[in-house]
């Protein structure tokens, strides 16, 4: 059974993806999510996922929700860097759709 503190910790870890990304990456990631550009989402465990972003080019994504900067993407922006790009954010929103809704609600309040 998940306790309230475990649930808060889990939510805090999940929100780390959004807080680690730039505003532009969050909005573009939300757009990718809404347009269903993330394919082949595979759950490794509760905090790790892999996927493919479909666009002009296809990119492979590894998402580590517990450690956002360990997430990787083969796009030019993120390759070899510890950057949370739009593809990583889109994978996060695809894995956790409620977080996409929460992100939009939070932005409406600002």
Predicted features along the sequence, with ranges:
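Long, low-complexity, compositionally biased intrinsically disordered regions
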Residues: 1-110
């Amino acid at each position: 059974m998940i306790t309230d503190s475990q649930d808060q910790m889990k939510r805090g870890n999940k929100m780390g993806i959004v807080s680690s990304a730039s505003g532009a990456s969050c909005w573009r990631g939300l757009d990718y999510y809404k347009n269903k550009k993330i394919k082949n989402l595979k759950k490794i465990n509760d905090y790790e996922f892999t996927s493919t972003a479909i666009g002009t080019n296809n990119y492979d994504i590894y998402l580590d929700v517990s450690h956002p900067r360990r997430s990787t993407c083969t796009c030019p922006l993120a390759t070899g860097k510890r950057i949370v790009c739009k593809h990583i954010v889109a994978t996060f929103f695809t894995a956790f759709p409620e977080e996409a809704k929460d992100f939009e609600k939070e932005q409406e309040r600002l």
